Amino acid sequence: MATGAGGLGKQHAGYLRKMGIDCITGGDCIFQKKDLVENLPQMPFVLRPCNLPEHSLGAGYRYFTARNGGKLAVVSILGRVGRHRLLADNPFTLMQALLPKIERETPFIVADFSSTATAEKQTMAFFLAGRISALVGSGSGAATADERLMSAECDLSGSGSDHVHIDMQTATVETCCEQQSRKTAYITDAGRTGSFDSVGGHAPSGKIREYRTGLFEYPQETWQRVCIQGVDIELDGAGGALSIERVRIEIPAAAVPQSS
C-alpha cells in the first residue's frame, strides 16, 4: 500500500480499515510517512516487519480472530537481498526463533514476505514448508504464476537430523514426516492493487525517459486499467492449506477516481 507513491499514510490506513480490511502488512516503506510512524502504537492492525531492530515502533506480528472464532497469526517479514530502505535482521534466523512462540497460541499462521529477490522468497518457502499455513510474497509489484501447496520434504538418507524438531518448552519431538501432512500455501508475489498498465504504478512515459537518459524522474501516478490482485487461500481445521488461487479483479473505469 502507498500514499503518494511512497509508503502508507495514516489517513489511508484508517480508510482501508473502515473498508473492512483487518490487517495491513508493511515492507521497507513502512516508516516512510511520519504520520503513520507516530501512530503505529495506536494502529495495531498495521504491521511492520518483525525482523527489524528490537526497539522499532509497532509490532511485527499479531493475532486476529476469524469469523468462525479461530485465532489467526499474521507475520510481516522483510528480506535482505537486493535494495531495501530498511536494514533488517536475518529473516530465517528470526522465523526459526519466533515460530515456536506463535505455535503455542495457534496453528493458523500466515506470513507476508516482502523482498525484491525471487530466490530469497522461494528459499523461505522451502524453509517454512509444512510449518506455517501460508507464505505470501510481495515487494516486486508484479504477480507471479507459481502458486502452489508445499509440504516438508523428508530426508530418506537416514542422516536428516535437521528434519527433527524438538520443542524444549513442551518436551515434544516432531519429525518432518509428521509435517508432511500439513500443506503450506505459497506464491512468490501476490501482485499489487493499482494500475495494471503501468510500471509498478507509475506512468510508463516517465520511466521510459528515465531509462533512456539515465536521469532520475520523479514518478507520476497513473490510473489506467486499475486491478485488484492477490490470492484466495483456504485452510483446514489443523492450520494446513487446502488451496490457493490467484485473484485479479479489474475495476470499471467509471468507478476509478482520476488524478487531478
Q: How would you label these PLM feature ranges?
A:
Residues 1-260:
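Acidic, metal/ion-coordinating pockets
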